[in-house]
Amino acid sequence: DAFGLYHFDGGPTYEYADARKGEHPDWGTQVFDLGRSEVRSFLFSNAMFWLEEYHADGLRVDAVSSMLYLDYGRQDGAWMPNIHGGKENLEAIEFFQKLNTAIFAAHPDVLMIAEESTAWPKVTHPVSDGGLGFNFKWNMGWMNDICHYIKLDPYFRQFNHRDITFSLMYAFSENYILPLSHDEVVHMKGSFLGKMPGDNAEKFAGVRAFYTYMLTHPGKKLTIMGTELGQWNEWHYEYSLDWHLLQYEPHRQIHQFFKAANAMYLEQSALWEQDDSWQGFQWLCADDNTANTVAFLRWDRERRPLVVVANFSPIHRKGYQVGLPFPGTWAPVFNTDAEEFGGAGLGDTTPIKSVDIPCHDQEQSMTIDLPPMSVMIYRCTRRAPVRKKKDSEKAGEKKTSGKVKKPEGAKDAGTAAKKTQAIKTVKKKDDQA
């Protein structure tokens, strides 16, 4: 930037001299010349200073994609390819690998987070495996999808159901952070509360439901300050948060909700022990788009599941059937529609026993009371033994090959009838002779 190191001594000092590599035309900023050892040393020293002198817990590297691609934000013919003729910035790749290697060698417990908005492979994989060496990456795809979905009128959400399910197609390819960051609440985009459709009660319900969906979705979490207050105004670095809102009941209630939701997250190890692999997640229902609902399981390392059911419609769904992985008693552990959070107090409050009714590809199920614009979470408090099926039930479930097996008596009668017919035929021929 012009207020920083831009042409520090009157000409390119820290940046590339060639404008095809040294300038971001969309932003009007300069690009560090990462091929020069003195520039790399300067950046390494800055990173270490923040960690060692200011004791920062970690660093987030902004706009990583703009450094990895030589053609980022540039028209054809306005960028310079690498020595192999490609668009990858080989110097930036080497820089990130060396930076992360040096930092983790000195401080193995810090966070190195990449804001990388493309599908660049192995951002959070070890350098030894050809990765960039970060330990976390912002999930920009999830953020864009969810911010598009929450702004929609609930009627139109059924046509955009993939916005809340597609992220599971790649959720475990990197170590992701789900970011509701400052980028989404600036420049007239509206606050998180302001994005929600409906009246005030529906807006607050939407915040509670989508934040809980975020907590139960695989990946670490990041939320912009002020969201926990139900802030109406966008975030701005020149102003403080609107703390005065806590004098109003709806904002005190949403504040209480965030405290309770975060405490629940810490208590339920299934939500964070295995959020980097399919071992910790299992879809129950991902395609009920007409109802705007999804249901899934989260598993901890002891194979103890949570059942999560989300309803992103304003319709109260009584008698909603949900599949279960095994029989038992399932108790609600969190309800975003609780009165203490500003909700209507709908939803289950007592444990539910499973029944032998198949649902969602599971042999067991339960029927729940699913409030409008809410998320319900259940855990098994008492696991029942699996009931052995009777022989008659097994026989009823057997698939036949097209030939029905007859009872023994019927088989004997059929054989006797055939023998009688054969005797009559022989006798008739003898008479004719």
Predicted regions located by residue number:
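Acidic, Ser/Thr/Pro-rich beta/coil linker or hinge segments at domain junctions
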Residues: 336-358
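Intrinsically disordered, polybasic Lys/Arg-rich low-complexity tracts
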Residues: 386-433
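C-terminal beta-strand-rich structural cap/linker in extracellular carbohydrate-active enzymes
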Residues: 350-389
